[in-house]
Amino acid sequence: MAQKTLLIITDGIGYRKDSDYNAFFHAKKPTYDLMFKTLPYSLIDTHGLSVGLPKGQMGNSEVGHMCIGAGRVLYQDLVKISLSLQNDGLKNNTAFLSAIQKSSVVHLMGLMSDGGVHSHIEHFIALALECEKFHKKVYLHLITDGRDVAPKSALTYLEIMQNICNESIQIATMSGRFYAMDRDNRFERIKLAYNSLMGLTDPTPLSPSEYIQSQYDKNITDEFIMPTCFKNYCGMQDDESFIFINFRNDRAREITSALGQKEFNGFKRQVFKKLHIATMTPYDKNFPYPILFPKESIQNTLAEVVSECNLTQSHIAETEKYAHVTFFINGGVETPFKNENRVLIQSPKVTTYDLKPEMSAKEVTLAVLEQMRLGTDLIIVNFANGDMVGHTGNFEASVKAVEAVDTSLGEILSLAKELNYAMLLTSDHGNCEHMKDENQNPLTNHTAGSVYCFVLGNGIKSIKNGALNNIASSVLKLMGIKAPATMDEPLF
């Protein structure tokens, strides 16, 4: 079966049964029509738990390409942490146990919402209750959201947090994310949040719910709630433990630096306490703190396996998707593997891609044809049109985008047959197959559905339905290479 192989990723072109405002359905696509008649094809899942995202959540290019390249499901932080907590994972979590065993007092801080972008309130609650089992005094430092969730939803989340409060668990401070989660070195904001954590802010006489309402009365929404501390809280003390429950790192670094770094230049701290700090995920490579959920090292990716076989490979895309067919598909590895060639085609310089829906598909295609004629063993290519034009919400332009991709596929398929190349064609997620909602409003987001997968290969008569984690092993099988045990089964 061993053949030189093409892996083609048609970004943003998905499957949808309904034809209304389905750019893929309405496009003139003779190459796709030919493939439907002559090649085995199936449907591939690209969203939700099948790619390591929360149930029902739409896929994206970063996660999609990581999953394709790894050949297995890589659970994203939100899902990985939630699954661990549901299975009592904290019982054996050395970073968590180390942090809480060093003090009778544990401070927990995090974004109080279920937005799932930076944190999740369920994680907040799980850690607080686990600390309570160890007979700790737990202080909650609540960061109000209003950005990833409704602008005035804090009272709803506060009620959930208050349900676990008792003599052991107490709400100590509150701050809008504008202050506690700055990421732009505006340390005057961080200072206000820091001072409340240290008990340097005059405590409000109001209860947490009254305080939120008082901010609303001043037309201040959740994101911008002024940092404060509540009565009976005296600030952090030396040798107490602190765990930041946010799993996204960019907006967690500054306040963590202020709390933990002895050498800190953001602002002059009136008080600096020696805390036993732990973070939910890696926030900064220079932070020395224990990490509850370390980053997973992704090894034995498709590109790595091919490289170890001393075969050649070329990764080709235009600017908009270049990182996806290099860094992301290689498991977060920036440096090319041995015998890995990379081709970057410049995306057109237009304000929005509906002005040029063909984008740089022609130039990308020429690069693919050149690599095929050179006999490159594996060619990975991304066509960005379906996604980037789909994001504009322009249905007519999205139809043209699909047609441009179809033209490119026709040229590649023709040469593949001539040169005996195998081919696997799929998408990282959908987009352009659903361009308007039931009220005729433009849809610009990815879809949470399936995508097509076509295979051209010697002796391949049928392929199974699957998910993106089945792609890498399928490509390796076409190439006659044994897939590593870390990869999931192929589609045929």
UniProtKB/Swiss-Prot annotation:
Binding-site residues, Mn(2+) 2 = D11, S61, D428, H429
**Leader sequence segment:** none
Positions annotated to bind Mn(2+) 1 = D387, H391, H446
Q: Which InterPro entries match?
A: Alkaline_phosphatase_core_sf, BPG-indep_PGM_N, Metalloenzyme, PGAM_B_sf, Pgm_bpd_ind
Q: What is this protein called?
A: 2,3-bisphosphoglycerate-independent phosphoglycerate mutase
Annotated Pfam families? iPGM_N, Metalloenzyme
Which superkingdom is the protein from? Answer: Bacteria
Q: Which organism is it from?
A: Helicobacter acinonychis (strain Sheeba)
Q: What metabolic or biological pathway is this protein involved in?
A: Carbohydrate degradation; glycolysis; pyruvate from D-glyceraldehyde 3-phosphate: step 3/5
Q: Which gene encodes it?
A: gpmI
What Enzyme Commission number(s) appear in the record? Answer: 5.4.2.12
Cofactor(s) the record lists: Mn(2+)
| Cited function | Catalyzes the interconversion of 2-phosphoglycerate and 3-phosphoglycerate.
Question: Catalytic center at which residues?
Answer: S61 (phosphoserine intermediate)
Mind listing the GO biological process terms from this record? glucose catabolic process; glycolytic process
For this protein, what is any one GO molecular function term? phosphoglycerate mutase activity
Q: Which reaction does it catalyse?
A: (2R)-2-phosphoglycerate = (2R)-3-phosphoglycerate
Q: How is its cofactor bound, per UniProt? A: Binds 2 manganese ions per subunit.
Q: Where does substrate bind?
A: H118, R147, D148, R177, R183, R248, N249, D250, R251, K321
Q: Which GO terms describe its cellular component?
A: cytosol
Assembly notes: Monomer.
The UniProt keyword set, sorted, is: Glycolysis, Isomerase, Manganese, Metal-binding
What family does this chain come from, according to its entry? Answer: Belongs to the BPG-independent phosphoglycerate mutase family.
Coiled-coil stretches noted in the UniProt entry, renumbered to this chain: none
What CDD domains does this protein's entry cite? Answer: iPGM (cd16010)
